[in-house]
């Protein structure tokens, strides 16, 4: 049984309070905190009556006057649970002063050379590209960043194919000695049993690209003859105890096969999906981009395969105002050039060179500061500024926007997918399985509360919270 608020308590007015429906459940979302709360239709109507002047007891009397038989105790329990979920918090957070931030994540491109030549590669990697610097240069760079970094700075080793870099192991060992957390992005083609043991020892996470369950599907984008080798590399890493993830880049061609990828992998290896984007060689493949509805359908299909419960990293009361590019994250090219993001390797976004300039001047420099300032979700555009999930989304992937329309301050081309998926995730965080709906739209709770109550449907439902026709679940 929930503890109850005092009936005389007056909940804050929530002018941006939004409601979304999935089946018999309703999500109440306060975008400004952000905070959310899942209830049924009756609970949603009660929350809508909070106008900043009515006490909980007043709200109960109003309901009773309209012939709705709900006990006061059940109403006070509902508002107590919503209060604990931070739904009625003010939701204002100050930002840290520029220059006080610490480096949290680095994409380290040891080389742009690769043993594959994928059709959509955003780095346009290929086998014949040069090696620009030695292992010692990158080891020095790792030490250079340490005074500016968090205790568990994440170094993502990438390329190209990072294992084609001479001295790969030496740079990795130096990163481990610095106390950094190592992550690896690889195509999985160069995983010998011995290397699998080395990777398992030094990397906390490995992401391997696999674009289909069969050679035919996989080879359409990544070249023929390597599907079996990639699967072998995945199994070797899994057998060595490494934490392996598989990433599938989704296009209309492999979309019908995405749900089969997990079947060819060890049970311990999860699958992640990302849409093909118009970056690098992918700019030539505009016809091969999936739309928002298709990506939503894929995500929901995966949710059903896991009983509708997928993890979410959203934290009530924690605002995501922007992508972390430049603010906490940077990318270092194989030339030593520093950029805010690994998908922003363009001259206009170059912040400096780690081999020739002091890192503090690069990281705290005016160019980076100006870039980060323009990344604020409320400064980007009118659509993001007024969006109900703006502080959960943070404005989406600015690289997607940059490469799609030429302006990173615009709206992510997968805005519809992001918004729907976040809503689904909030339901799941409260233990509610999400079922598919027709299209992207969902019903909303609109109109004056008094008129809404006149058409109120049956309150009978399975209860996960209190009785009395009010159902409630929270993310806590």
Model-derived features: where do they sit?
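Acidic, low-complexity/disordered tracts enriched in E/D and polar residues
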Residues: 1-49, 66, 472-474
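Radical SAM enzyme [4Fe-4S]-AdoMet core and its adjacent flexible, acidic
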Residues: 1-3, 17, 178, 202, ...
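Cysteine-cluster motifs in flexible loop/terminal segments that predominantly coordinate metals
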Residues: 378-424
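C-terminal accessory region of radical SAM enzymes
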Residues: 289-318, 343-394, 430-437
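Long, charge-rich, low-complexity alpha-helical segments
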Residues: 35-108
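Conserved Radical SAM active-site core
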Residues: 127-185, 189-205
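Canonical Radical SAM [4Fe-4S] cluster-binding loop centered on the CxxxCxxC motif
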Residues: 99-137, 149
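Local cysteine-cluster metal-coordination motifs and their immediate loop/turn environment
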Residues: 113-123, 325, 340-343, 381-399
């Amino acid at each position: 049984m929930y503890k109850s608020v005092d009936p005389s308590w007056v909940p804050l007015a929530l002018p941006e309070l939004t409601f979304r429906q999935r089946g018999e459940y309703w999500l109440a979302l306060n975008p400004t905190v952000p905070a959310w709360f899942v209830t049924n239709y009756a609970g949603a109507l009660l929350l809508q009556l909070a106008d900043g002047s009515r006490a909980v007891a007043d709200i109960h009397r109003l309901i009773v006057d309209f012939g709705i038989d709900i006990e006061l105790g059940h109403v006070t329990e509902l508002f107590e649970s919503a209060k604990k979920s931070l739904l009625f918090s003010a939701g204002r957070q100050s930002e840290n002063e520029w220059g006080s931030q610490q480096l949290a994540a680095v994409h380290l491109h040891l080389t742009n050379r690769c043993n594959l030549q994928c059709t959509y590669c955003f780095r346009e990697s290929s086998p014949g590209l040069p090696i620009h610097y030695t292992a010692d240069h990158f080891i020095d760079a790792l030490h250079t960043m340490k005074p500016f970094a968090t205790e568990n700075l994440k170094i993502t080793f990438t390329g190209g194919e990072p294992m084609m870099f001479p001295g790969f192991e030496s740079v990795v060992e130096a990163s481990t000695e610095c106390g950094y957390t190592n992550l690896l992005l690889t195509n999985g083609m160069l995983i010998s049993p011995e290397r699998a043991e080395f990777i398992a020892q030094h990397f906390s996470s490995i992401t391997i690209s696999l674009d289909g369950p069969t050679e035919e599907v996989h080879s359409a984008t990544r070249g023929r003859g390597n599907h079996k080798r990639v699967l072998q590399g995945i199994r070797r890493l899994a057998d060595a105890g490494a934490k392996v993830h598989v990433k599938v880049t989704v296009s209309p061609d492999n979309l019908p096969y995405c749900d089969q990828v997990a079947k060819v992998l060890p049970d311990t290896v999860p699958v992640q999906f990302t849409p093909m984007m118009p970056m690098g060689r992918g700019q030539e493949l505009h016809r091969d981009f999936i739309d928002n509805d298709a990506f939503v359908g894929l995500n929901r299909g995966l949710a059903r395969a896991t009983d509708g419960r997928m993890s979410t990293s959203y934290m009530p009361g924690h605002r995501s105002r922007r992508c972390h590019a430049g603010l906490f994250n940077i990318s270092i090219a194989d030339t030593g050039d520093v950029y805010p993001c690994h998908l922003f390797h363009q001259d206009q976004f170059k912040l400096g060179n780690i081999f020739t300039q002091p890192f503090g001047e690069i990281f705290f420099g005016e160019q980076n500061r100006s870039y980060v300032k323009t990344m604020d979700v409320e400064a980007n555009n009118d659509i993001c500024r007024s969006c109900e999930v703006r502080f959960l989304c943070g404005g989406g992937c600015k690289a997607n926007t940059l490469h799609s329309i030429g302006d990173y301050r615009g709206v992510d081309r997968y805005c519809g997918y992001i918004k729907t998926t976040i809503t689904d995730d909030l339901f799941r965080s409260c233990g509610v399985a999400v079922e598919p709906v027709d299209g992207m739209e969902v019903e909303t709770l609109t109109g004056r509360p008094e008129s809404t109550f006149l058409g109120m449907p049956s309150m009978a439902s399975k209860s996960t919270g209190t009785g009395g026709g009010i159902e409630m679940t929270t993310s806590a």
